[in-house]
C-alpha cells in the first residue's frame, strides 16, 4: 500500500509575508527547506540508496543557494499586481523556481564541462569523485555525467510537483500553469540556441540577442514577474 503523500505546508506559509524583497527571499527559503525535507522523506521511502546518493546531494546543492534573483522578481510581480496578505502561493512559486534553476544549472555544467558551481564541485564532478572513492568499476566521468543528468531531472520533478500543488490550490491556477509551461520551454530553447551557437562558432549579433532574450530577459525576469502577478 502506498504511504501518505508528503506535504510541505507549515504555519509560516499562511502568515503575512514581509513586504521587502530580501524578507521575501528569506521567507521563500524557509518554504523551500520544508519542501526539501518532504521530498527527502519521500526519497527515503522510495529507496535508501537513491535517497543517500542522489536526493541528499540535490538537497545540499539547492541549499547552497545563489542570488535568488528569480524569487525576488516573483515577489515584485506579486506586489506590483496588488498582492498583499497571505503570501503562501507566491512563496511556493518562488521555491519551485529555485528547484527549476537547480535543474538548469546542473545540466548546464554537464554541457559546459564546468568543474565548479557556487564555490563547490559541480554535480557531475561530485558524483565522479564519489565513484572513484567507492572504487566502482567503469568510467568515473561517464558515471558522474549520467548521474548528474538524473539529478537535474529530479530537481525538475520536484519543481513541477510543487508548482502543480500550488496551482491546483489557487483560483489563478490556469494562469500559473500557462506561464510555467512557457518558461520551461523558453529555458530549454535558450540553452539549445546557446549550445548550437557554440558548436557553429556563430558570433552573429541577432543570434546572441535571441539567446539573451530566451535565457535572461524571459527566463530570469519576465516570466518570474508574470508568475508573481498571476
Report each predicted region and the residues it spans:
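All-alpha helical catalytic cores of prenyl diphosphate-utilizing isoprenoid enzymes
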Residues: 44-48, 62-70, 146-230
Amino acid at each position: 500500500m502506498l504511504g501518505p503523500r508528503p506535504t510541505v505546508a507549515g504555519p509560516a506559509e499562511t502568515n503575512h509575508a514581509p513586504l521587502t524583497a530580501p524578507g521575501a527571499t528569506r521567507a521563500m527559503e524557509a518554504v523551500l527547506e520544508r519542501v526539501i525535507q518532504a521530498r527527502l522523506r519521500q526519497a527515503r521511502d522510495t529507496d535508501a540508496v537513491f535517497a543517500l546518493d542522489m536526493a541528499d546531494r540535490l538537497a545540499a546543492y539547492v541549499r547552497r543557494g545563489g542570488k535568488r534573483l528569480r524569487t525576488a522578481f516573483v515577489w515584485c510581480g506579486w506586489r506590483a499586481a496588488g498582492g498583499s496578505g497571505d503570501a503562501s502561493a507566491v512563496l511556493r512559486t518562488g521555491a519551485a523556481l529555485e528547484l527549476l534553476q537547480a535543474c538548469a544549472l546542473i545540466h548546464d555544467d554537464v554541457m559546459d564541462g564546468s568543474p565548479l558551481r557556487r564555490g563547490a564541485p559541480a554535480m557531475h564532478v561530485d558524483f565522479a569523485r564519489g565513484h572513484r572513492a567507492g572504487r566502482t568499476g567503469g568510467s568515473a566521468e561517464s558515471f558522474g555525467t549520467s548521474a548528474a543528468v538524473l539529478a537535474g531531472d529530479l530537481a525538475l520533478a520536484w519543481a513541477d510537483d510543487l508548482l502543480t500543488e500550488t496551482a491546483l490550490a489557487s483560483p489563478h491556477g490556469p494562469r500559473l500553469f500557462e506561464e510555467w509551461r512557457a518558461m520551461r520551454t523558453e529555458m530549454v530553447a535558450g540553452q539549445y540556441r546557446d549550445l548550437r551557437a557554440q558548436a557553429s562558432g556563430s558570433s552573429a549579433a541577432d543570434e546572441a540577442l535571441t539567446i539573451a532574450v530566451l535565457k535572461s530577459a524571459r527566463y530570469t525576469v519576465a516570466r518570474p514577474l508574470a508568475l508573481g502577478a498571476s
